[in-house]
């Protein structure tokens, strides 16, 4: 009997250790400046303090921020690598990107429309040239690899949320004169005969998995896109543009999250997205913008489980 009691007490004592072993980790990327001045000026960097406030309130202890000049493609990839290396089973991970988006030629031939959707790091050029073929664009193919690597580390009990306050298309007319749009209407066209962009993209993915020590290549560039084994919140539908708030000059999706999380504790994902869309609609004057939620994990855990204590 005494042995059973001791065993039971030991089990109880072990529970807090297991609970505390779960770590909340975040990577926050915000861009309001670009090395290539052909990109229109936006305020993605101003989103970062709002996101930091959300994460602090939600109890995130490990937060990496990359703002403007620090958010190069190499810097972002390195942050993903460090995040993956640090993650453990059951961790909660939040990835936030505020910046430009652009479509470019799908060099891996795995997209139905022939276009990759890209995040735009600090050192990415807006147009292809004799010396630039999309090497610094961060494609959805690469992002899927990095995010799936994190998912594999945190396991089935882990939670992964990705927020993208950008869009992958734009409108040259920009609607109202003072509208600031995150995204551009032109596609970066890569010459299929020029393999430079493909090579660097492939090498980045390869080194992420196997390093530079010549181990067997585990990446198949012709494979279908990896599954979206997380929840993604995007600022708008693919056929819409993402227009910033006028006051304050920040991302509309980021500001909606910051505002609504102050007013709500824990609700289901459908209800939470309903509130986010309602906020965006209230603050949209020129063109419709509807935030979207996608991913295989939509019914597995709640967004507010991640972004609140």
Task: Give residue spans per PLM region.
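Bacterial N-terminal signal peptides
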Residues: 7-16
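Cysteine endopeptidase catalytic domains of the caspase/legumain-like
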Residues: 21-309
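Bacterial N-terminal signal peptides that target proteins for export
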Residues: 1-7
């Amino acid at each position: 009997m005494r042995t059973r009691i001791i065993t039971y007490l030991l089990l109880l004592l072990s529970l807090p250790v297991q609970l505390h072993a779960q770590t909340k980790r975040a990577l926050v990327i915000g861009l309001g400046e670009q090395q290539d001045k052909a990109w229109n000026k936006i305020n993605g960097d101003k989103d970062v303090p709002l996101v930091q406030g959300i994460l602090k309130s939600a109890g995130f202890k490990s937060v990496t921020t990359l703002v403007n000049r620090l958010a190069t493609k190499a810097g972002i990839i390195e942050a993903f690598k460090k995040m993956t290396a640090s993650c453990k089973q059951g961790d909660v991970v939040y990835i936030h990107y505020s910046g430009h988006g652009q479509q470019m030629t799908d060099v891996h031939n795995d997209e139905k429309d022939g276009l990759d959707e890209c995040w735009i790091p600090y050192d990415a050029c807006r147009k292809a040239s004799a010396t630039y073929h999309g090497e610094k664009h961060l494609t959805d193919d690469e992002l899927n690899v990095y995010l799936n690597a994190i998912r594999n580390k945190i396991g089935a009990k882990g939670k992964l949320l990705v927020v993208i306050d950008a869009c992958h298309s734009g409108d040259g007319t920009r609607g109202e004169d003072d509208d600031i749009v995150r995204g551009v209407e032109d596609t970066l066209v890569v010459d299929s005969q020029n393999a430079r962009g493909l090579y660097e993209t492939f090498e980045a993915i390869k080194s992420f998995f196997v390093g530079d020590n010549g181990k067997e290549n585990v990446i198949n560039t012709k494979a279908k896109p990896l599954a979206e084994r997380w929840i993604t919140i995007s600022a708008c539908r693919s056929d819409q543009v993402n227009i910033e708030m006028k006051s304050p000059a920040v991302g509309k999706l980021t500001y909606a999250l910051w505002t609504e999380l102050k007013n709500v504790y824990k609700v289901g994902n459908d209800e939470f997205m309903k509130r986010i869309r309602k906020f965006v609609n209230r603050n949209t004057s020129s063109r419709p913008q509807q935030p979207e939620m996608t991913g295989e994990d939509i019914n597995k855990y709640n967004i507010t489980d991640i972004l609140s204590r």
